[in-house]
């Protein structure tokens, strides 16, 4: 499968596939361990900034629905840009580039606001539409409902995977959003087995802490709060960017460099 998809150690003669796999895994944990403290800081910053969006999602289904809707509206205008800023920080950690956490986060929020705003809106609204559609087909029953529900579920998986690639491309390339989404969709399909594996890892972590919160007991709430506020978000992001960055780099960055080299030679 090519776990995490990186090649920090180049593949050469005499190196088995299993050995390369081990090197990739070791490289991931080595990088994550060295950046652990910085990732906690980035996690706290991102968690605090998207907290209104999280609260909005939770409260819209409660007796505080009006407050939830207000917070959700705020989230519509901030979630995408905040996520792009967070992704920039994580990408730089993966690339082993220096990061000025607060200033870089603020700067990237401003720089990528326009292009990441619509993606953030899609990220909030589209899952709601999928959930409504899935519940509808679940209730009507029958084979048609099963097939339709399967299609909705597959669409949700592809949608989540597209985000793996869209935000790193937003903070790296000067492309229009439709081109970013097109490329992200191609990556989602071409690298589907690896993407699905990473989605399962990410989903398991988020699901665990979400279930702790929904347990409605004090210990569960504390576990959920500590997990989400300190490391869950940055760990999921680091796993994802560490995996997809090599694919983006190989397919888009090296290609751009080759085209630039040809252009210079022709001059």
Region annotations inferred by a language model:
Residues 147-159:
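Alpha-helical transmembrane segments of multi-pass membrane proteins
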Residues 1-135, 144-145, 162-164, 169-267:
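Helix-coil boundary and N-terminal low-complexity module in membrane systems
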Residues 139-140:
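Short helix-loop junctions at transmembrane helix boundaries
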């Amino acid at each position: 499968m090519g776990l995490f998809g990186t090649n920090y150690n180049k593949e050469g003669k005499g190196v088995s596939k299993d050995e390369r796999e081990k090197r990739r895994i070791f490289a991931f944990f080595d990088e994550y361990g060295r950046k652990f403290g910085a990732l906690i800081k980035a996690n706290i910053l991102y968690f605090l900034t998207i907290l209104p969006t999280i609260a909005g999602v939770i409260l819209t289904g409660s007796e505080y629905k009006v407050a939830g809707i207000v917070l959700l509206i705020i989230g519509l205008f901030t979630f995408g840009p905040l996520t792009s800023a967070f992704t920039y920080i994580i990408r730089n950690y993966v690339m082993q580039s220096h990061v000025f956490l607060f200033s870089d986060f603020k700067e990237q929020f401003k720089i990528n606001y326009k292009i990441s705003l619509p993606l953030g809106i899609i990220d909030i609204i589209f899952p709601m539409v999928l959930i409504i559609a899935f519940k509808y087909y679940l209730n009507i029953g029958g084979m048609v409902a099963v097939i339709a529900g399967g299609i909705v579920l597959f669409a949700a998986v592809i949608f989540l995977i597209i985000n793996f690639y869209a935000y790193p491309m937003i903070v790296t390339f000067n492309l229009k959003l439709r081109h970013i989404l097109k490329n992200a969709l191609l990556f989602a399909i071409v690298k589907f087995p690896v993407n699905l594996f990473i989605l399962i890892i990410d989903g398991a972590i988020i699901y665990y802490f979400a279930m702790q919160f929904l347990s409605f007991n004090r210990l569960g709430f504390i576990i959920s709060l500590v997990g989400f506020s300190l490391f869950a978000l940055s760990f999921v992001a680091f796993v994802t960017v560490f995996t997809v960055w090599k694919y983006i780099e190989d397919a888009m960055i090296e290609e751009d460099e080759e085209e630039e080299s040809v252009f210079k030679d022709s001059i």
